[in-house]
């Protein structure tokens, strides 16, 4: 009898016998403005804090790779992003509801 994967308490998807977990990723992005501004306005610009929700494809020392869409019966991934680790503030694994 084939071995069945254990049910996880976290939201995930299994593709080709590999489990990918769903995360809420909080990260910082550049904010730009090409208009003229005085010093006070220029110094007041701050990076944008962004939220992305996606499946974690893989991560290494420098990058986190995610996907949001996939082919159910094959290893085809869409809506992909690569986040430099230095930009990621927090990664939260999402519980299954």
Q: In which residue ranges do the predicted regions lie?
A:
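Conserved RNA-binding domains used in RNP assembly and mRNA/RNA metabolism
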Residues: 2-97
